[in-house]
Amino acid sequence: MQEQYNPQEIEQKVQQHWDDSETFVVSEDPNKEKFYCLSMFPYPSGRLHMGHVRNYTIGDVVSRFQRLQGKNVMQPIGWDAFGLPAENAAVKNNTAPAPWTYENIEYMKNQLKLLGFGYDWKREFATCTPEYYRWEQEFFTKLYEQGLVYKKTSSVNWCPNDQTVLANEQVEDGCCWRCDTPVEQKKIPQWFIKITEYAQELLDDLDNLEGWPEMVKTMQRNWIGRSEGVELSFAVNGEEAPLEVYTTRPDTLMGVSYVGIAAGHPLAEKASKNNPELAAFVEECRNTKVAEAELATMEKKGMDTGLTAIHPLNGRVVPVYVANFVLMDYGTGAVMAVPAHDQRDYEFATKYGIDIIPVIKPEDGSELDVSEAAYTEKGVLFDSGEFDGLAFQEAFDAIAAKLEAEGKGKKTVNFRLRDWGVSRQRYWGAPIPMVTTEDGEVHPVPADQLPVILPEDVVMDGVTSPIKADKSWAETTFNGEPALRETDTFDTFMESSWYYARYCSPQADDILDPEKANYWLPVDQYVGGIEHACMHLLYSRFFHKLLRDAGYVTSDEPFKQLLCQGMVLADAFYHENEKGTKEWIAPTDVTVERDGKGRIEKAVDDQGREVEHSGMIKMSKSKNNGIDPQEMVDKYGADTVRLFMMFASPADMTLEWQESGVEGANRFLKRVWKLVHAHSSKGAAETVDASALSGNQKALRRDIHKTIAKVTDDIGRRQTFNTAIAAIMELMNKLAKAPQESVQDRAILDEALKAVVRMLYPMTPHISYEMWIALGESNVDSATWPTFDEKALVEDEKTIVVMINGKLRAKLTVAADATEEQVRELGLNDENAKKFLDGLTIRKVIFVPGKLLNIVAN
């Protein structure tokens, strides 16, 4: 073992050993407990960023910890390789998405290896290869045959200038990002998978996910959005078909003063035919894409259609308005509006002078006031005829029963969740395996003709998808008849919804090998960002249930435990140019002066300009405050970067990047190295003889075993990796000061260092590998996690604090099993205590075993 710690040399050597010996390549072993650890796979954007490093370090720490617990650990990696950024980069760099993607994969793969992550590289795949998406295509055709896939028209963002569909992120302030043309909403046929068929199960099974953060489960519950309500009909004057509305508040029915319909509702289209003003308003609403989250805050606009509806119970005639806050995608595209008891309806009614009819008053008898805002609480009905005096649930049931009896409504369960639209009008995605014959019939591509391969040698013009532009690509046959291929591609969430399962049998000649899949699944630990709570994590749960119902897997859920790591933040600096726009300056190009509390007082860039400090914010390209992991690894070594990542903050909280913290982690590793070197260079040590230890030696050994117990619990159960590292650091401080003279001193240090090296191994595997060999052991990758000795934790002696009238006056060292009488006698005879009791009468003595003797005297 060299005296100086040289991370670059060590890491290169150890990584080569892992590659050569295929340390992390695994197969099914029925005799061993399995552990499947997975971090969300990366999009091959070109370079790893610190967010990746944090995510993958956490996954690797869990994997290596479980490995030393003796489990059969699988930790795979791959590439989420389809998607829009590749198309944009291809246009910008005058290339095709495929070569750009494959080059990035090679570069990033090398970066992952330099960080020392223990992946089974034999399981690696990229989702953009036909070997992967072929099975997705086949599974989709099976779902179609089961009636779980259908096609319907749905709105998309349309650029009339480029004549192309835009993704949401390509719409900037309502305009096309390329040509600045106002974007329109256009209806086109698209493919959907019936996730709504599984809505109730997806909701119910959240209760079984005990290893998931409560916040993620709440987000999914809200996204699925189960509600119990009433679906009821309003007859429309002059129309045959009634207006169907859904409400969760039938108790407010008698307060309805208008009906609101979405701009896309058939009635709105009909009413606007002979009303140019209404037609223009409908068009404006349709081309204003509204996110559901914005509904509460946006300006409420509407227009009277001239149509009237008839209240189903009291016969009141109410106007029908087109309203911009009613969305066609949710419910029936029509709402019954009760301004007195719904704030959105209230704002709209106030603006357009529509009646506000209160019908609910507070249960506590306080005065009802709707002069400034709606009263939205549940309460007691009044001015509601036969329903007066009823509370919410009674009114709900009674009104629903009456509507049902009259054939005008029924109780129903509604979900906010919509079917999954999987069509994308983009090129760089898996082709949807459907064809249309000349008679207009749609058919799935037969299994023996799969995969439908996406051509990779294409020219991107930045506007039209190459497979849409090349008419010959779509031309094919079906049962000998001419047919046209679907030129839309799958939503890239399709690939990431089942990749975790493909890792179990990446070479299988089917979507999965059930035997292998059921050995490994479900994933024991999944690590990724909380931003995926509602899309990726929900789609994966759905896909898992589809795979189960198709007979491939036996489990109900894909991921047992979920850890959502926090974001990585860094200081951000900017300079305002003459135009008043912010130029973001990289933190590495800024010199800062700090005050006594470490706050930045002044910042100057490398051109000598004073720059503004914007605070600690998420690392991003747009703010130019990303720190390149490569530079940090080159400077300090992978182990240091990994250790800092795990120590600087709890895994699920934001992490503030501070290079001073990285330097601190590096100094700590040097200290450990130095102590191991000093100890090992003296030759082999004896084993600990517990019966021959002095009091101080026993105390140190107790600290060692307490640390093992704490670190084991912190990493294994609590996943508070930062406190585990803090405990190891604390122990190292004690070991550095401990005597190393006697045989038993060296024996204890040897036991301690062997424990420390194994406890550090998950975080810092390269240095641990070297130190383990220096300590006379063979291979730390196949070592056993240290176990704490229960006997070592037992204390022979206790320190008892003596308090006199609430103030600390003495400390006693007593036998661990000392009785109250013995402690009392020692306490009252302690020289210091006697001083403070002189001349006082003892009134009360309180004894807390093993801790405290409290004396009250006056």
Curated annotation (Swiss-Prot):
It catalyses: tRNA(Leu) + L-leucine + ATP = L-leucyl-tRNA(Leu) + AMP + diphosphate. GO terms for molecular function: aminoacyl-tRNA deacylase activity; ATP binding; leucine-tRNA ligase activity. ATP binds at K621. Its main location: cytoplasm. A motif ('KMSKS' region) lies at residues 618-622. InterPro entries: aa-tRNA-synth_I_CS, aa-tRNA-synth_Ia, Leu-tRNA-ligase, Leu_tRNA-synth_edit, M/V/L/I-tRNA-synth_anticd-bd, Methionyl/Leucyl_tRNA_Synth, Rossmann-like_a/b/a_fold, tRNAsynth_Ia_anticodon-bd. Keywords: Aminoacyl-tRNA synthetase, ATP-binding, Cytoplasm, Ligase, Nucleotide-binding, Protein biosynthesis. Its EC number is 6.1.1.4. Pfam families: Anticodon_1, tRNA-synt_1, tRNA-synt_1_2, tRNA-synt_1g. It comes from the Bacteria. A motif ('HIGH' region) lies at residues 42-52. This is Leucine--tRNA ligase. It comes from Vibrio atlanticus (strain LGP32) (Vibrio splendidus (strain Mel32)).
